[in-house]
Amino acid sequence: MLVAGWSAGGNIAAVTCQLARDRGGPDIAGQLLVCPVTDCTFDRPSYNDNATGYFLTRSLMYWFWDLYCSPADRTDPRVSPLRGKVAGLPPAFVVTCEFDPLRDEGVAYAEAMAAAGVPVEHLRASGHFHSSFAMVDVVITGVPGRAQMAGALRRFAGLPEVSRGDESSKGHDSPEHRIAAAAS
């Protein structure tokens, strides 16, 4: 099983990995966390650097947190996974974007997992903002990053990498083949 999530979904994926480890399953082979929400604090530099102007704003994050849970519950690791135990988690591919209020908490989560011995790949997406990877036909600079994410999921699943010109990929029109072709 693999888990993946973007933003709040990244939070859910991270918490799912911690709960699966603590409860003895299910076995998770890898986690893809794209711009994940990992902590309830707003005092990291990226919250000031990217407070406005890049789709996801600091004030919008305040609003989301107020909808999600009470201030008293925010430090619970099931809400803020950065505050939980990160040792023993499955391999991770973490994406953070330069112009994202969540950048620094994503970096902190990737660094905490790596320090605890979790295999971590970290894509620091320069020039990207919180939702730019989802804008497939608009932000074409996201193609290589999306290909890296797909490659990580394939590795976690034990599948071979797909590359343009691979004889086995000729004549196929699956999404992973289109991603590989666009990225090369």
Where are the regions a protein language model picked out?
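Alpha/beta-hydrolase superfamily serine-hydrolase fold, recognizing
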Residues: 1-184
